[in-house]
């Protein structure tokens, strides 16, 4: 028999240090066990703090749901792909649903913006902290790891499902997810760029994310030695937005467009716009960046919209920049 952890429990485990990134097994839904108090106790004995969030697991049919203290059952009447976490001496498995199944499950519980942010995390090389605050009551910073899945894999899994509300929500969210984000800052910038105008974003289309570690002073990037930088590249428009965690631009200097080679490995010259974290936080600076990118696509960002774009932009920025 198999106890398969799901939903918020699976997400917290993926954010922990004990979660293996290999060992996928096919779990027949007939083998899903009915959770017992012993299962909950075994889960609570894992070497991470689990007391602050409930145990979510999947069962094969509604009659197998149980009112277990500290547990919650969800029905998933189909075979699934899961990662084997532990195996008992009796041969029973403790598994965690795959990232693809997790994304679809969370589509029923998260808002669109939250689901897109989760997609960036699953398809990126970073994890947000578990839901256990430090002494100040604030979650700790993100950690590095290999990507758990990709946009292509998430889409492939969704295609195999029915046409319920979860699938529709997940399909919409994946329109705005990009592979390869390595930090929450990259996710923030990319989300603001790709969300449509009606949501308060810039509607600039989905870019690719490229990374570069600068080993010496680089006047083109305006970086100091050892800074990590990334670029959002719109290849079809021949333009990129280059970000670095350190910059020496003047306090009131707006981002500028310059012509240079974006990546030596690509052998292509693009127009690059250098920005810093301060530019992302200042709406007028990021408006300037978005306008330059839009011109690279041969269009202008309209201001005379039928709806109040300024208020929607403020609401979106508040959710994206202040909710990590």
Enumerate the predicted regions with their spans.
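Short gly/ser-rich loop at a beta-strand->alpha-helix junction or flexible surface loop bordering the NTP-binding
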Residues: 1-166, 190, 298-301, 305, ...
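Surface segments flanking catalytic/ligand-binding clefts of nucleic-acid enzymes
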Residues: 142-324
